[in-house]
C-alpha cells in the first residue's frame, strides 16, 4: 500500500495527462497511463497516478466529463472545427503598355485571377516608364504619366503581368524602348505577347526570316510569301530585277519608310537615302492589288477583314478605304496558325496579305500584340484580349507555390482516409481486436494494427489535445496514448499475444478484467498481469461501460451480458473504493 502511495504521489503525473482530459480537476487526481503490455512496461516505466485527495468527488467529476464525451466516442469522429477565415491575397498588378486613347481598366473591371484575387491595372506608354531589375528582387517599375505638360501620376510598383499594346521600337519616330523590354525580361515578368517575341519583333527583316522558314516548310501553294530582297546597307543596292519595286527602309510602322520606285534612276536616288539613314533596306516587287487582307487571331478567336482603297493610293492604309469582314477560310486559318507558332508562340497576332488583280494572294507581313484593331468589333477584340490576359494570369503559380484557398477542417480528410473495408463493421467471432480510441478517433474494423498508428491524419484527430503516437508505435505492443483511457484498459487487460493480432472486430474481443473485482475473480484470471490499485479502476471501469455503447447498437446477446457484468463490476468498484 505504501508503495502505491509513493507511486501515486509522483509529481510528473500531471505532465503526462493529455490537454483537456478531466478539465474540472485542478489538482493531481485520478487517471491512468498504463503501458500497452508487460514488455512495454519493462522498457518504458511510467508513473501510474497521483494521490487522491477526494476519491468520491474525483470519480463523479470523471463520470460527468466522460458522459459528455460519450456521443463523440460513439460517432467515431470529432466535430469539425468552425470555418476559418480564408487567406486574403494581395491584388495582382497588371501593367498595360498602351497610349492614353484606350482605358484598359474598364475591360478588367470585376475580373479576378482564379475567381479570388483582384486585378489592379496600371496603364502607361513606354516613354512614361523606367525600371530597375534584379536577379532575386524582380523588377521595380517607376511610372510618371504626363498629360498636357502636367505630371498626373508618379508611383513605383512591381508588376505581376504585362500586356504589350505598343511598339517597342520605331526608327521613323526615333523611339527605341528595347532596353525597357530587356529590363522587363530581366525581371522575369510574364507578358502577352511574351517579352521574347516582343524583342524579336523589333526588326521586321528578322520577323520576315521566320516567314521564309514557314514558306519553305509549307510551300508556295499553302503559304504564298511575297518575293523580297534584303540589303544590310546601301552598297549592294545597285539595281532591282524588275520595276516597279517597293523599297522599305529600316524598321517602321503604319506605312512609314516605304517608297514605290518606278525605274532605275529613282532606285539610285533611294540608294543615297539609305546611305544617309545608315540602316538596312528591303525591296519587293510591287503588286497591283485589288484589296488587302488581314487575318487576326486573339487567343482562339479568328477574324478576317478585307480593305479596299477608294482614293486610288497604292497604300491601302492611306487615304479613304472601305473595310468589311469576310468569312474565315481554312486557308486563312492555316496562315495565321503557322505564324502564331514563331518565337515560342504568339497569343495575339495578325497576318497581312495582298490580293492582286490577277487573283493571287501574297503574304507581306505579320504583326504581334501591338497590332492596331480595326473594324466594327474593336470593343469585342479588346474584351477578348482582357479575357486572354486573365486566363494567362490564372495559369501562373501563386507566390509560395500554393493556391489561395480557405483552411478546411480535418473531418473530411479522415473520412477520405478510410478504406472501403473500414466502413463495414461486422462481428467476426473468434478473432480478438484491441478497441479503437473512444474520444473521436476513427473506427478501424479490418485494417491491421500498425496502419492505425501509421496514418498521420488519424494521429492528429485525437480531441482535447491528445499527443500523436511516436514513430516507433508501428508494433501493437507500443501503441499507447495517455489521453485514451480505453486504450489503457484494453492494453492492460489483454495479453501481448492478443494485442498483436490484426484484423479483428470489436464484438469478439475477450472482456478484460476490472481491477475492482473480488479475489476469486482475480484467481480465475491468473494468467493476466496483476491489477493496479482499486482507486485506479474507476476511470477504466467507466470507459468499459462507455465503450460498449459503440457495439451495443448491434444488439448481440453476448454484448448485453457483458454490459450487465460491467455495470455490476462498476458497483463493486464503488463499494471497494468507499470501503478503503
Curated annotation (Swiss-Prot):
Residue spans of biased composition, Polar residues class: 489-500
Main subcellular location of this protein, as a coarse class: membrane
Record's keyword annotation contains Membrane: yes
UniProt subcellular location: Cytoplasmic vesicle, Secretory vesicle, Synaptic vesicle membrane
Keyword Nucleotidyltransferase appears in the UniProt entry: no
One example GO MF annotation: ATP binding
Region span, E: 532-580
Annotated membrane topology: Peripheral membrane protein
GO cellular component: extrinsic component of synaptic vesicle membrane; glutamatergic synapse; postsynaptic density; synaptic vesicle; synaptic vesicle membrane
Biased composition (Low complexity): 30-39, 47-56, 419-432, 441-488, 537-553
Residues covered by region (J): 400-531
PTM annotation: Phosphorylation at Ser-9 dissociates synapsins from synaptic vesicles.
Keyword entries, A-Z: ATP-binding, Calcium, Cytoplasmic vesicle, Membrane, Nucleotide-binding, Phosphoprotein, Synapse
SUPFAM superfamilies (alphabetical): Glutathione synthetase ATP-binding domain-like (SSF56059), PreATP-grasp domain (SSF52440)
Modification sites for Phosphoserine: 9, 455, 462, 470, 475, 481, 484, 541
Note: Regulated by calcium. Calcium inhibits ATP binding to the C-domain.
Functional note: May be involved in the regulation of neurotransmitter release and synaptogenesis.
Comment text on domains: The A region binds phospholipids with a preference for negatively charged species.
Family listed: Belongs to the synapsin family.
Subunit structure: Interacts with CAPON.
Record PANTHER family: SYNAPSIN, SYNAPSIN-3
Protein name (Swiss-Prot/TrEMBL): Synapsin-3
Species for this entry: Homo sapiens
Amino acid at each position: 500500500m505504501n508503495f502505491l502511495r509513493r507511486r501515486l504521489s509522483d509529481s510528473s503525473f500531471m505532465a503526462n495527462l493529455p490537454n483537456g482530459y478531466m478539465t474540472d480537476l485542478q489538482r493531481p487526481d485520478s487517471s491512468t497511463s498504463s503501458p500497452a503490455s508487460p514488455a512495454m512496461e519493462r522498457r518504458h516505466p511510467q508513473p501510474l497516478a497521483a494521490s487522491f485527495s477526494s476519491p468520491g468527488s474525483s470519480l463523479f467529476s470523471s463520470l460527468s466529463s466522460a458522459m459528455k464525451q460519450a456521443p463523440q466516442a460513439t460517432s467515431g469522429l470529432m466535430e469539425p472545427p468552425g470555418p476559418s477565415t480564408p487567406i486574403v491575397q494581395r491584388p495582382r498588378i497588371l501593367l498595360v503598355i498602351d497610349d492614353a486613347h484606350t482605358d484598359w481598366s474598364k475591360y478588367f473591371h470585376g475580373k479576378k485571377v482564379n475567381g479570388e484575387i483582384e486585378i489592379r491595372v496600371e496603364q502607361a506608354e513606354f516613354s512614361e516608364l523606367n525600371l530597375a531589375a534584379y536577379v532575386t528582387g524582380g523588377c521595380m517599375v517607376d511610372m510618371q504619366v504626363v498629360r498636357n505638360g502636367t505630371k498626373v501620376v508618379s508611383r513605383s510598383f512591381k508588376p505581376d503581368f504585362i500586356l504589350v499594346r505598343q511598339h517597342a521600337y520605331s526608327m521613323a519616330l526615333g523611339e527605341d524602348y528595347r532596353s525597357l523590354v530587356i529590363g522587363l525580361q530581366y525581371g522575369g515578368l510574364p507578358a502577352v505577347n511574351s517579352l521574347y517575341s516582343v524583342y524579336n519583333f523589333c526588326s521586321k527583316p528578322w520577323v520576315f526570316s521566320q516567314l521564309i522558314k514557314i514558306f519553305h516548310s509549307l510551300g508556295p501553294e499553302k503559304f504564298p510569301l511575297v518575293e523580297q530582297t534584303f540589303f544590310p546597307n546601301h552598297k549592294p543596292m545597285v539595281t532591282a530585277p524588275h520595276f516597279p519595286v517597293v523599297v522599305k527602309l529600316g524598321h517602321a510602322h503604319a506605312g512609314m519608310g516605304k517608297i514605290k520606285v518606278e525605274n532605275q534612276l529613282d532606285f539610285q536616288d533611294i540608294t543615297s537615302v539609305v546611305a544617309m539613314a545608315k540602316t538596312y533596306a528591303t525591296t519587293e516587287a510591287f503588286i497591283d492589288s485589288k484589296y488587302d487582307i488581314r487575318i487576326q487571331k486573339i487567343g482562339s478567336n479568328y477574324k478576317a477583314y478585307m480593305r479596299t482603297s477608294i482614293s486610288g493610293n497604292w497604300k491601302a492604309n492611306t487615304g479613304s478605304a472601305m473595310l468589311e469582314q469576310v468569312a474565315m477560310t481554312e486557308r486563312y486559318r492555316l496562315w495565321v496558325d503557322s505564324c502564331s507558332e514563331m518565337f515560342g508562340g504568339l497569343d495575339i497576332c495578325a497576318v497581312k496579305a495582298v490580293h492582286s488583280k490577277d487573283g493571287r494572294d501574297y503574304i507581306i507581313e505579320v504583326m504581334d500584340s501591338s497590332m492596331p484593331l480595326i473594324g466594327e468589333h474593336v470593343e469585342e477584340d479588346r474584351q477578348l484580349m482582357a479575357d486572354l490576359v486573365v486566363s494567362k494570369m490564372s495559369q501562373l503559380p501563386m507566390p509560395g507555390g500554393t493556391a489561395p484557398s480557405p483552411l478546411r477542417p480535418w473531418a473530411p480528410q479522415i473520412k477520405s482516409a478510410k478504406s472501403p473495408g473500414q466502413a463495414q463493421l461486422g462481428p467476426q467471432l473468434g478473432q480478438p481486436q484491441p478497441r479503437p480510441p473512444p474520444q473521436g478517433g476513427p473506427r478501424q474494423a479490418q485494417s491491421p494494427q500498425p496502419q492505425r498508428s501509421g496514418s498521420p491524419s488519424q494521429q492528429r484527430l485525437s480531441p482535447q489535445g491528445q499527443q500523436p503516437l511516436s514513430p516507433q508505435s508501428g508494433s501493437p505492443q507500443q501503441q499507447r496514448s495517455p489521453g485514451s483511457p480505453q486504450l489503457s484498459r484494453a492494453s492492460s487487460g489483454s495479453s501481448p499475444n492478443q494485442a498483436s493480432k490484426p484484423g479483428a472486430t470489436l464484438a469478439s474481443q475477450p472482456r478484460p478484467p476490472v481491477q475492482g473485482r473480488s479475489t476469486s475473480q482475480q484467481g480465475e484470471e491468473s494468467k493476466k498481469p496483476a491489477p493496479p490499485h482499486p482507486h485506479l479502476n474507476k476511470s477504466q471501469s467507466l470507459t468499459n461501460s462507455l465503450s460498449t455503447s459503440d457495439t451495443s447498437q448491434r444488439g448481440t446477446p453476448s454484448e448485453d451480458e457483458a454490459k450487465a457484468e460491467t455495470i455490476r463490476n462498476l458497483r463493486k468498484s464503488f463499494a471497494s473504493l468507499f470501503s478503503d
